[in-house]
Amino acid sequence: MEYIIFAAVMACIVILFMAKGIYDYKQSEKKFIRKRYSDYGVLPQREYKPEQFESISHYYQKHADGFCIDDITWNDLNMDEIFKKMNFTYSAAGEEYLYYVLRRPCMEDKELLHREEIIRFFQEHADERVAYQVMYHRLRRTGKFSIYDYLDYLDGLGRRSNMPHYLALILLAVSIGVLFTDVAFGILMLVCVLAFNNVSYFKVKGEIDPYIVSFAYVFRLLDAVKNLKSKVRKTESLKEEFEILRKSSASMGGFKRGSFILMSSGRMSGSGNPLDMLLDFIRMGFHLDLIKFNQMLSETRKHVSDIDSMITTLGKIEAMIAIGEYRASLEEYCIPEFADKRGLHAEELYHPLIDEPVKNTIATSSSVLITGSNASGKSTFLKTVAINSLFAQTIHTCLAKRYETPIFRMVSSMSLKDDVQGGDSYYMVEIKSIKRILDLTLSGEAPVLCFVDEVLRGTNTVERIAASTQILKSLR
């Protein structure tokens, strides 16, 4: 009787903890929803650890094709800080795709117009936007590693067999059977088998733990797709994206089947759950999660392209939501106009990192040489034009009253440093940087919009003027 009372009390305690956890989670989500309405357009205050920020670029590194913004130009424009101000995302898929968007300008306006459709829909429909943001908040981030790091590491696991785990189950079943014939020996055997199973469990679990995190994220991806299908309003703007998600998720049924063995709801949501303690004891003894892990590993390897499609598509939608919210944070912005004629026309441009900027206007159909006294804002103006040129072909948003330009490939050489480790002096770094610009102009694709600040400042005046003259002639 005492055992029954004890078990009942323990069950009540577990239920109370579960109820408290569910209540806290619901309250936290309600608070999140309220803030998404009230704080729309308020700049994010997130702090990034170096390893977390570094991993954000990994989707881009995997998908960098065609013309991309190179590291020199990215650093010249201080784009890391601009990205942080723009990062209104809540999932790894969203923030990694937003980074990708900023580093890969569109070379035709068709994709930009499609992005504009999605951005505008979420700007004009607050309830739908918040519903999506709640879904992305549940999807969450992956910590200091990108999901693509985990997917890459899968190959390092090699082929894995479930035979040792089946053997552990057989030994456990035999020891339980012996209990019915010889209690003393059966208990001894059961203790030994459980000890062996626990030791072998933790040895293998230590190897696979990082990948369980990735599987949990894939599961949340599938859950997000399911929520989009059933709970979130569908729009014509997202018709193409919904079709991609439908096809990608349809092939992943084997991955989800029985996944609760490996991943409890707490593991998948990242929120934790008291029931996990009980489940962990079962996993230790029976190795059920290790068996399921190997099955899910096999499924993941077969469907890497489908997982990539889901990450890309879900990330794209959230990135567009973030761009819309970034627009709401701006004092003034415009939608860029793209023309076939050569030239650049912009009214009242301003820099995104300056709180009280001085706005400037530029209208030119040829090369421009900017002169002026020290600290007059020449470099800042160059960067302002360059950033808005990049914004026009990425987020379809310019910090200006009006912005008109053709489609460009944009490149710069501004904030260079000597490369001590590489053995290059400041002068050689400048020469190599300028050469990459000249090489780009000779490729014969879209026209190049280049920004050079203080050409060849690392050499003497006579050589600097002579070399600069020839460089400028080549860039005309």
Residue positions per predicted region:
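Alpha-helical bundle segments enriched in helix-capping/polar residues
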Residues: M1-S366
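ATPase nucleotide-binding head domains, primarily ABC-like/P-loop NTPase cores
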Residues: I323-Y326, L330-R476
